[in-house]
């Protein structure tokens, strides 16, 4: 990425910026139609939004809500938090790639907007706990919640570090399908966000069944 700030030379540039300064894409939160939103950093603001609501539920057993950092540059935060907490189970909340746009067909879509939460059995960094995976889909069926799985082994998230911490941690990821992931104009459907939250809310209560 080359950024032209209009400086004439090095000395001129140093008046405005320093080595190591951070930059970001300017992007405004926008509503698209009746139930879609566009914003930067929906991965992982979507996960944060779900967690904030889950915190208000006051879980019946000891639950740690961790807002990890630096996932995109090495799963650093999740590695430290998983080592510190050593949980019995972990649920990763995030957004994941939806390529359901013109010119993309079949399995290459990975997942689609409007089809609910994405519960993966596997991605590039994790093989998820099969009992958690099955429980998630059982709950979705019982509560009539739309739910899908990825049609390709693609992407990864904090689960990649969490599930291999210590003696291993039983882990599942529940994701909101998101177009244009990692861009300044991510797009999701609010129904998918709400249905993902409802799924995780029930899942977190029923984990002791496993």
PLM ranges: what are they?
Residues 1-210:
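N-terminal hydrophobic/helix-forming segments and targeting peptides
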């Amino acid at each position: 990425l080359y950024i032209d700030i209009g400086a004439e030379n090095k000395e001129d540039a140093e008046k405005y910026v320093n080595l190591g300064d951070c930059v970001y894409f300017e992007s405004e939160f926008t509503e698209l139609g009746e139930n879609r939103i566009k914003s930067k950093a929906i991965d992982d603001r979507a996960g944060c939004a779900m967690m904030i609501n889950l915190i208000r539920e006051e879980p019946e057993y000891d639950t740690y809500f961790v807002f990890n950092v630096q996932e995109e540059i090495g799963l650093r935060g999740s590695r430290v938090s998983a080592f510190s907490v050593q949980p019995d189970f972990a649920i990763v909340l995030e957004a994941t790639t939806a390529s359901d746009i013109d010119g993309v067909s079949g399995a290459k879509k990975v997942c689609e907007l409007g089809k609910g939460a994405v519960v993966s059995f596997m991605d590039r960094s994790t093989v998820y706990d099969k009992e958690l995976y099955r429980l998630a889909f059982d709950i979705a069926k019982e509560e009539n919640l739309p739910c899908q799985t990825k049609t390709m082994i693609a992407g990864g998230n904090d689960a990649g570090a969490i599930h291999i911490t210590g003696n291993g941690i039983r882990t599942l990821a529940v994701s909101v399908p998101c177009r244009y992931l990692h861009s300044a104009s991510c797009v999701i459907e609010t129904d998918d966000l709400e249905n993902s939250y409802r799924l995780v809310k029930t899942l977190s209560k029923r984990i002791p069944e496993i």
